[in-house]
Amino acid sequence: MAGLGPSDFKVYEDGVPQQLKFFSVDPFPISAAIVVDTDLPAGTMKKVNETLPALVGAFTEFDEVALYRYGHTVQQISGFTGATGLSTASLNRIKRTGREGGPPVAGGPFGGPSINGHSVNDPNAGGQGDVPTAPKESYVLNDAILLAARDLGRRDKTRRRIIFVISDGREQGSNAGYDEVKRILLANDISIYAVGVDTAAIPIYDQANRIRVPGFGTGNILPRYVSDTAGDMMAEFDRQGIEQAYAKITDTARNQYTIGYTTQATKSSAFRSVDVRVLRPNLKVYAKEGYYPLPPSTQK
């Protein structure tokens, strides 16, 4: 909503009212780490590949971007560079064909020919008591966001720092846990923006994906990251919708009310809650619920 001024806002840190020292409605240049899930199903991956030029086009000449991809591992494709100077070669390096079908089937009626319950192609078929299991899949979303956040934390503080994730949101096999990643994000004032694709774009499947099944990882955790960092997420299924989401999300990230206050210096790294209120009726506020102070030696 446009037209709000400093007097329309009240900010509380740990319940204590704060005096605003900074207020702006001007658009901010963006530092964006673009994180792409390249282990999506082949059909979805094809759509994402085709939309990558539109993603780059959603940024301005004042923005900078870095590219990352992940599946069972994380890889930085390019470091931070001006968005308009991002090379075609870098975009091509992020493209993948995606996975075909579902996870491998190692047993049951669809597991191929067997003798006494053992695959005829199994060199250990003569063994006793072995239980066929499917190879464990991994989708290291937490690790990907953590790597991007650490790199992004070193960028200029005067820029708006965001991680732009394109994924179905599944998490399995990361070394980093959710709470660890969240702490790094909040300590470095980084917001997560996301385009949910594939099952994350289908409401009934998306709801099921948010349930954790022991041994199978977590489904769509992107909404948690988005909510905890005051970002935004759009779920799109077709190519045109994905491309439109890119433009809407970057516009949202760039154009926000920016308010600031001077907090009390302390050596403590404990979480500090922040409550932002707008003194007008029927408005919903999107703001981070708090932050973790950086150690004095790392603050710039």
Per-range role (PLM):
Residues 1-300:
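Scaffold/interface architecture of coatomer-like assemblies
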